[in-house]
């Protein structure tokens, strides 16, 4: 079967569209709404117009949705076709907020790229319409992200990823024609909707319609206040993602450069969230052992991912008794920085501000949970994403590539293990927990410290762990992408789960591809495996690879907390949850 494109003959596959064949053969046809990684082709933007001749005659058609037929003749480059494509782009711009310089996506926008690709030098319609579309929603009610519908081009990618990957279906298409916009279902606003603020919609949005809530000015205010002691910390995955924002290859470890950059902008203390990850394993592992030995709720689910916690509270509150009460590493670090650290360093905790650099949008929401505050004062004051941190450094004129590496600051909360590093990958929390739980129960380390069945990008993975003759074997599971968590939660509630412990990460690939990480236009997590492998290499290079072997963790428990699971540890390092159910539980198919 053959067709002709711009005078040249090509063979095509059964069911293939014009745009798919063109891409496969390196023929450029401008497009916007189509998103190949998700198989998404709603044909709403109509930019990929081509002229076709087939048995039905000559006509214009959208290349993304038009299937090929034998003998079809396609024109994508004539003056007439180019004019039609350009006109369509002009109309999209005319219905779009054109204050580009203030947009978070300025210079990294697919719509701007599209204007260049069709040769748009002047918009005939701009002077005839308001520069900013009227009556469009600007919703800033959510803690982690903003929705500006004046910048929405109705590509429906956000609706697709929310439904197809996350199974949340918080976003809907409301209205018709030019009055159509993306809404939040029956909710009054974003904050009260079914959205779990994972940020995966931001990762696929081609414009600035969806974005993290920028808090860099708050950070700069803290840095400039001489009465404040700023404590910065960053997550495991940040060190293998941030470099991409400054032109470095995916997976390059820039840990030392991050510390150096933070010192350059005036940070007083730089800690490692990896330390807190080791503390999480000590608490979560102790909690799991208690549940196994004393008939507690099984399976126990991890609690590190705030997107998952939001999902559990809003969609499956019945599962909350199964969710570990151990705080996330971010929340653990914030609590310890304003108690253990301030005591050890003789600092007034009232003047300490904790700034957390995360790969995650939902972490912003987590930091504002009232359960993670003491006397109304949040343990973590500000959370900025990888993208925000890159913008912050640029505001200080810093190129990370040029920064000399520096070590973490103090001897109290800066040591970590390989187990903490792999928290950044799906399966990492479970693998770290298995390493420590096995050692506590058997008195010896795992024969093979790397638990291969828990690694990789499969939606759901499981492993069987031998805990010695007295304790037998347990099955554990991990999943990433919340649609995959639905079945595991349903089985647990029905008493059908064969697992003792289940790790859930909201974002595909885990934190290395969180909603606050670097975006690659028209791609969806293309560097997940590269970033994961970088974390695994770091794990292998660490002198200690089990959380219980971290000397600073041992010192903290010996000097301050007592033992894992102690009353003081529970007061500082554990939390609680409550139902915020918005919609009936539902299984959303692929």
What are these regions (language model features)?
Residues 46-197, 203, 210-229:
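Fe-S ferredoxin-like electron-transfer domains
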Residues 11, 141, 151, 194, ...:
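Charged, low-complexity surface patches
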Residues 166, 205, 341-345:
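Structural motif corresponding to the C-terminal cap of alpha-helices
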Residues 14-77, 81, 93, 213-590:
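Iron-sulfur-associated redox domains of electron-transfer enzymes in respiratory
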Residues 1-2:
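Extreme N-terminal starter segment of soluble prokaryotic enzymes
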Residues 11, 154, 301:
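Conserved SAM-binding loop
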